[in-house]
Amino acid sequence: WRIGFCRTGAYAGRVCIPSFDEGGNLSYFIARTYKNDFPKYKNPPVDRNVVFNELYIDWQEPVILVEGVFDAIVAGNALPLLGSTLSERSQVFKRIIEECPTVYMALDADAAKKEMRIIKLLLQYDLKVYKVSTSGYDDVGSMTKGEFLKRKEGAALIDQTNYLYQCLSL
């Protein structure tokens, strides 16, 4: 992940995590405070429509969609959305549709409705979608890798048939 931190300058007091495109070029980075400063994140003033961590994604394996970079570190072959939404116009969405027929969703429990909207979108493209429970934790990043893997193994397959039931159970 090539994680670093800044002691001085515009990003002082922040952990910096770079993202590299498939050619190995720096495409973006996030800078998160490790103090109790506000704002929590201070990111570069460039377009963030990138596939974060693209260089290290194995597109031959299922990918895991998570909200943040620290979640992705725990999850493994994961794409951080840098939020809790996914647009059809985004590079992440386009790569998933082109390359990855199976997706695991693991957004924070407080984003359940947004997660179901993403699942609905992915199902419209005939992808196989599993929902990983994050209940009992703030997010994937607060789990151990072992706990996340256990939850991933027990993930619920969401299809057109049970999608509505899942929405009603929120």
Task: Enumerate the predicted regions with their spans.
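Short, surface-exposed amphipathic charged segments that create phosphate/polyanion-binding patches used
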Residues: 15, 94-100, 139-154
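Short, aromatic/basic amphipathic alpha-helical patches
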Residues: 114-126
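Acidic beta-strand-to-loop metal/phosphate-binding motif
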Residues: 65, 100-114, 132-133
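A generic structural motif
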Residues: 128-139
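Phosphate-handling DNA/RNA-contact segment within nucleic-acid enzymes
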Residues: 6-102
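Phosphate- and divalent-cation-binding pockets in alpha/beta enzyme and binding domains
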Residues: 74-75, 114, 139-140
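TOPRIM metal-binding catalytic domain and adjacent DNA-binding surface shared by DnaG-type primases
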Residues: 1-16, 20-23, 57-58, 97, ...
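Short, acidic/turn-prone active-site loops that include or flank metal/cofactor-
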Residues: 82-90, 108-111, 134-136
